[in-house]
A protein has these predicted regions:
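Small-residue-biased structural context
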Residues: 1-168
Length: 168
Protein backbone atom coordinates (compact mmCIF):
# COMPACT_ATOMS: atom_id res chain seq x y z
CA UNK A 1 0.00 0.00 0.00
CA UNK A 2 1.17 3.52 -0.80
CA UNK A 3 2.69 5.24 2.24
CA UNK A 4 0.35 8.24 1.93
CA UNK A 5 -2.65 5.90 2.17
CA UNK A 6 -1.11 4.18 5.18
CA UNK A 7 -0.79 7.62 6.79
CA UNK A 8 -4.41 8.47 5.94
CA UNK A 9 -5.64 5.18 7.40
CA UNK A 10 -3.70 5.95 10.60
CA UNK A 11 -5.25 9.41 10.74
CA UNK A 12 -8.65 7.74 10.53
CA UNK A 13 -7.82 5.51 13.49
CA UNK A 14 -6.73 8.64 15.39
CA UNK A 15 -10.02 10.34 14.46
CA UNK A 16 -11.94 7.33 15.75
CA UNK A 17 -10.10 7.69 19.06
CA UNK A 18 -11.06 11.36 19.13
CA UNK A 19 -14.69 10.37 18.53
CA UNK A 20 -14.63 8.13 21.60
CA UNK A 21 -13.33 11.05 23.69
CA UNK A 22 -15.96 13.31 22.15
CA UNK A 23 -18.76 10.90 23.08
CA UNK A 24 -17.45 10.73 26.64
CA UNK A 25 -17.24 14.53 26.90
CA UNK A 26 -20.75 15.05 25.50
CA UNK A 27 -22.08 12.45 27.94
CA UNK A 28 -20.42 14.26 30.83
CA UNK A 29 -21.84 17.62 29.75
CA UNK A 30 -25.32 16.07 29.56
CA UNK A 31 -24.96 14.46 33.02
CA UNK A 32 -22.90 17.01 34.95
CA UNK A 33 -22.95 20.22 32.95
CA UNK A 34 -19.74 22.13 32.43
CA UNK A 35 -19.32 22.62 36.16
CA UNK A 36 -18.22 18.96 36.45
CA UNK A 37 -14.56 18.49 37.36
CA UNK A 38 -12.41 18.78 34.25
CA UNK A 39 -15.31 18.98 31.79
CA UNK A 40 -14.26 22.34 30.32
CA UNK A 41 -10.64 21.21 30.13
CA UNK A 42 -11.72 18.09 28.24
CA UNK A 43 -13.78 20.17 25.81
CA UNK A 44 -10.83 22.49 25.22
CA UNK A 45 -8.55 19.52 24.59
CA UNK A 46 -11.05 18.11 22.10
CA UNK A 47 -11.30 21.46 20.34
CA UNK A 48 -7.53 21.49 19.86
CA UNK A 49 -7.49 17.86 18.75
CA UNK A 50 -10.18 18.50 16.16
CA UNK A 51 -8.39 21.61 14.94
CA UNK A 52 -5.04 19.87 14.74
CA UNK A 53 -5.71 16.36 13.57
CA UNK A 54 -8.97 16.21 11.68
CA UNK A 55 -8.70 19.52 9.86
CA UNK A 56 -5.06 18.88 8.88
CA UNK A 57 -6.16 15.50 7.53
CA UNK A 58 -8.79 17.22 5.38
CA UNK A 59 -6.25 19.77 4.15
CA UNK A 60 -3.80 17.05 3.12
CA UNK A 61 -6.50 15.15 1.24
CA UNK A 62 -7.82 18.29 -0.44
CA UNK A 63 -4.45 19.72 -1.41
CA UNK A 64 -2.58 16.51 -2.25
CA UNK A 65 -4.67 13.42 -2.99
CA UNK A 66 -7.81 14.98 -4.47
CA UNK A 67 -6.08 17.14 -7.11
CA UNK A 68 -4.02 14.24 -8.44
CA UNK A 69 -6.88 11.75 -8.34
CA UNK A 70 -9.01 14.43 -10.03
CA UNK A 71 -6.93 13.89 -13.16
CA UNK A 72 -8.73 10.56 -13.52
CA UNK A 73 -12.20 11.22 -12.15
CA UNK A 74 -14.36 14.32 -12.33
CA UNK A 75 -13.81 16.33 -9.18
CA UNK A 76 -16.98 18.37 -9.79
CA UNK A 77 -19.13 15.29 -9.22
CA UNK A 78 -18.66 11.80 -7.89
CA UNK A 79 -16.69 10.78 -4.82
CA UNK A 80 -14.30 13.75 -4.65
CA UNK A 81 -17.14 16.28 -4.81
CA UNK A 82 -19.17 14.34 -2.24
CA UNK A 83 -16.24 14.11 0.17
CA UNK A 84 -15.39 17.81 -0.30
CA UNK A 85 -19.00 18.65 0.55
CA UNK A 86 -18.75 16.52 3.69
CA UNK A 87 -15.51 18.29 4.63
CA UNK A 88 -17.35 21.63 4.34
CA UNK A 89 -20.20 20.35 6.52
CA UNK A 90 -17.70 19.06 9.08
CA UNK A 91 -15.95 22.44 9.14
CA UNK A 92 -19.28 24.12 9.90
CA UNK A 93 -19.97 21.65 12.72
CA UNK A 94 -16.45 22.14 14.03
CA UNK A 95 -17.01 25.91 14.07
CA UNK A 96 -20.26 25.42 16.01
CA UNK A 97 -18.40 23.20 18.49
CA UNK A 98 -15.60 25.78 18.86
CA UNK A 99 -18.09 28.59 19.31
CA UNK A 100 -19.94 26.70 22.03
CA UNK A 101 -16.74 25.70 23.86
CA UNK A 102 -15.50 29.30 23.75
CA UNK A 103 -18.84 30.55 25.10
CA UNK A 104 -18.76 28.01 27.92
CA UNK A 105 -15.15 28.91 28.75
CA UNK A 106 -16.27 32.55 28.97
CA UNK A 107 -18.91 31.54 31.52
CA UNK A 108 -21.95 31.95 29.28
CA UNK A 109 -24.88 29.68 30.08
CA UNK A 110 -27.86 30.36 27.81
CA UNK A 111 -28.12 27.12 25.84
CA UNK A 112 -24.40 26.72 25.17
CA UNK A 113 -24.19 23.33 26.89
CA UNK A 114 -26.90 22.05 24.55
CA UNK A 115 -25.14 23.61 21.55
CA UNK A 116 -21.82 21.96 22.39
CA UNK A 117 -23.59 18.62 22.77
CA UNK A 118 -25.52 19.03 19.52
CA UNK A 119 -22.37 19.92 17.58
CA UNK A 120 -20.40 17.08 19.18
CA UNK A 121 -23.14 14.56 18.42
CA UNK A 122 -23.41 15.79 14.83
CA UNK A 123 -19.64 15.38 14.37
CA UNK A 124 -19.79 11.92 15.93
CA UNK A 125 -22.68 10.98 13.66
CA UNK A 126 -21.03 12.16 10.47
CA UNK A 127 -17.37 11.23 10.73
CA UNK A 128 -17.58 7.40 10.89
CA UNK A 129 -19.59 7.22 7.66
CA UNK A 130 -17.21 9.69 6.02
CA UNK A 131 -14.23 7.57 7.02
CA UNK A 132 -15.94 4.47 5.63
CA UNK A 133 -16.52 6.18 2.27
CA UNK A 134 -12.89 7.17 2.00
CA UNK A 135 -11.58 3.77 3.01
CA UNK A 136 -13.97 1.69 0.92
CA UNK A 137 -14.27 3.88 -2.19
CA UNK A 138 -11.73 6.68 -2.53
CA UNK A 139 -8.56 5.06 -1.26
CA UNK A 140 -8.97 1.84 -3.30
CA UNK A 141 -9.78 3.99 -6.33
CA UNK A 142 -6.60 6.01 -5.82
CA UNK A 143 -4.54 2.87 -5.33
CA UNK A 144 -5.88 1.40 -8.56
CA UNK A 145 -5.65 4.53 -10.71
CA UNK A 146 -2.52 6.41 -9.68
CA UNK A 147 0.86 5.50 -11.09
CA UNK A 148 4.20 5.97 -9.35
CA UNK A 149 4.81 9.43 -10.84
CA UNK A 150 1.38 10.52 -9.68
CA UNK A 151 2.08 9.23 -6.16
CA UNK A 152 5.27 11.31 -6.32
CA UNK A 153 3.05 14.31 -7.11
CA UNK A 154 0.77 13.45 -4.17
CA UNK A 155 3.79 13.23 -1.84
CA UNK A 156 5.16 16.56 -3.10
CA UNK A 157 1.79 18.29 -2.69
CA UNK A 158 1.39 16.69 0.76
CA UNK A 159 4.73 18.16 1.85
CA UNK A 160 3.72 21.56 0.48
CA UNK A 161 0.41 21.40 2.36
CA UNK A 162 2.25 20.60 5.58
CA UNK A 163 4.88 23.28 5.01
CA UNK A 164 2.18 25.91 4.47
CA UNK A 165 0.92 25.54 8.04
CA UNK A 166 4.00 24.54 10.03
CA UNK A 167 5.84 27.34 11.81
CA UNK A 168 9.21 28.22 10.34
Amino acid sequence: MESILTELFQRHRDAEGMLAKLATAVGRVRREGVSGAGVLDDLGDLRREIQGEVLSHFREEEQALFPVLGRHIDSASGPIAMLMEEHAIFRQLELQFEEAVAALEAGLKDGWEEKVCDAGEAIAGMLPEHIEKEESVLFPMAEGMLGEEEWDDVRRLWKEALAAVLPT
